[in-house]
Amino acid sequence: MATLLDIEGTVCSISFVHDILFPYALEKLPQLLKNEQFPIKPGGNQTSDLTPYLESFPEEYKQSAQALEDHVIDLTEKNVKAPYLKALQGYIWKSGYQSGEIKAPLYPDAVDYMKRVVDGGNKVFIYSSGSVPAQKLLFGYSSAGDLTPLISDYFDTVNAGPKMEAASYTTILKAIGFEADRVLFLSDNVREIEAAKKAGLRAYVAERPGNAKLTPQEKEDNVIKTSFEGIEI
């Protein structure tokens, strides 16, 4: 058996991502861009660790530091889950986690659940719109310490696909080698839950403080969990 976990609004609060992580990346970006040579060109003279992340941006935003910064601000404000943005954010967050400026405040019941799953001989997998490197940082530098030994693998929109499409969950099932009915998915997003169900997974909606309010119909159509205490996979 296995459990597949979303992150934002499921194992940690939405406010951590929107109020801590996103602003941190925006604050650090201008100084980082000062060390880059614009326009950014593939195979150019840039040699910094940041350059490969910037090369993934659309051409029109690589002409100047201001254009790129404005684009990042726009995507962040609109919460657009573009893979190239997520990769850049993960790169910037890495220094914050490693310096101790950032520590992911995971819900204690989520941490306990992950430990129970693994102690029971089962597996934990992560599926988030945040990049896989960013996911590893979040669990590696959490309020409960380094939880990466508990996690068997990580999935994002690059290696699995969009979270609201059933095909993405089928891709994950093939990668982890489990039948659909042997995997429990937990997420705060009802559309993700619906997509997972279409792929045959069992799926519960996480209802956490600060999450989007569920409609009466959504509550009727889904299993709702306000805590992971007592959840058995």
From Swiss-Prot:
> Does the record bear NAD in its keywords?
no
EC identifiers of the protein: 3.1.3.77
Q: In which pathway does it act?
A: Amino-acid biosynthesis; L-methionine biosynthesis via salvage pathway; L-methionine from S-methyl-5-thio-alpha-D-ribose 1-phosphate: step 3/6; Amino-acid biosynthesis; L-methionine biosynthesis via salvage pathway; L-methionine from S-methyl-5-thio-alpha-D-ribose 1-phosphate: step 4/6
Pfam family example for this protein? Answer: Hydrolase
Question: GO terms for CC?
Answer: cytoplasm; nucleus
Coiled-coil regions in this chain?
none
Q: How is the cofactor bound?
A: Binds 1 Mg(2+) ion per subunit.
Give residues annotated as binding substrate: 128-129, 163
UniProt cross-references to CDD domains, sorted A to Z? HAD_EP
Q: Main site of residence?
A: cytoplasm
In the record, biological process GO terms are: L-methionine salvage from methylthioadenosine
The UniProt annotation places Mg(2+) binding at 6, 8, 188
Q: How does it assemble?
A: Monomer.
Q: Any idea what job this protein has? A: Bifunctional enzyme that catalyzes the enolization of 2,3-diketo-5-methylthiopentyl-1-phosphate (DK-MTP-1-P) into the intermediate 2-hydroxy-3-keto-5-methylthiopentenyl-1-phosphate (HK-MTPenyl-1-P), which is then dephosphorylated to form the acireductone 1,2-dihydroxy-3-keto-5-methylthiopentene (DHK-MTPene).
Q: Which family does it belong to?
A: Belongs to the HAD-like hydrolase superfamily. MasA/MtnC family.
The cross-references to PANTHER family, in alphabetical order and at most eight, read: ENOLASE-PHOSPHATASE E1
Could you tell me what this protein is called? Enolase-phosphatase E1
To which species is this protein native? Yarrowia lipolytica (strain CLIB 122 / E 150) (Yeast)
